[in-house]
Swiss-Prot record:
GO biological-process terms attached to the record: diaminopimelate biosynthetic process; lysine biosynthetic process via diaminopimelate
Localisation per UniProt entry: Cytoplasm
Residues annotated for substrate binding in this entry: R106, D143
Pfam families the record matches: Hexapep_2, THDPS_N_2
Protein name in the entry: 2,3,4,5-tetrahydropyridine-2,6-dicarboxylate N-succinyltransferase
Pathway: Amino-acid biosynthesis; L-lysine biosynthesis via DAP pathway; LL-2,6-diaminopimelate from (S)-tetrahydrodipicolinate (succinylase route): step 1/3
Species classification: Bacteria, Pseudomonadati, Pseudomonadota, Betaproteobacteria, Burkholderiales
Species the sequence originates in: Ralstonia nicotianae (strain ATCC BAA-1114 / GMI1000)
Amino acid sequence: MSQQLQSLIEQAWEDRANLSPKAAPNDVRAAVANVIDQLDQGALRVAEKKDGQWIVNQWVKKAVLLSFRLEDNAPMTAGGFTHFYDKVPSKFASYTADDFARGGFRVVPPAVARRGSFIGKNAVLMPSYVNIGAYVDEGTMVDTWATVGSCAQIGKNVHLSGGVGIGGVLEPLQANPVIIEDNCFIGARSEVVEGVIVEENSVISMGVYLGQSTKIYDRETGEVHYGRVPAGSVVVPGNLPSKDGTYSLYCAVIVKKVDAQTRAKTSLNELLRGD
């Protein structure tokens, strides 16, 4: 089934210039709707870790993009306090108390998650934003004013602190999603974009900005990483001098590996999770 679905999406992608809300074959509409539905349930992901490597399902990302070609804007309401006009409905638009109980997560007003995003059990959405295609795994806290961009992959027991920005893939168009692996702590107002991978058990300090061109300097080894924070790293903002010493440029610095002291400062509060 998934192979047939993928084939339909790939064909529709090649013909995307000819697609619109008023001009699209029924099988294409059904295929795109199927993908969005599976993303919403967590049955399908834009990226998966297999044999220790992250594999991006580009065709799934294409289905997300195609959904914008196929849908018209429509009025939407939010709890009676305001109105919206958009192509993608809220994930929770038709949720009942039973649906929330089955989901096993908390959603604090006025948090927004778009349909096609997945929220795992014991996750907590403070007033935040989760975009279409994103995957937020079990036990993760998305704190106030944090943003989880389109198709971003957030692991288990992650803490995204207040105002954190996790970049998406839709605009500007990115090849790969941002991935935050299990048990990571992302400090307040930090930004992770352009498909950067933060590997498991890492701690990112406040105000760290990570993109593909950001130098990630390991002060113990002198090694410079791009696009990847090694597992168990503690990262803070810093600067590196130019070759001629006339100026310095921003970088991120790996100051040490996570230890017991770091964990004590960044541990999750189980009282905030669960039923």
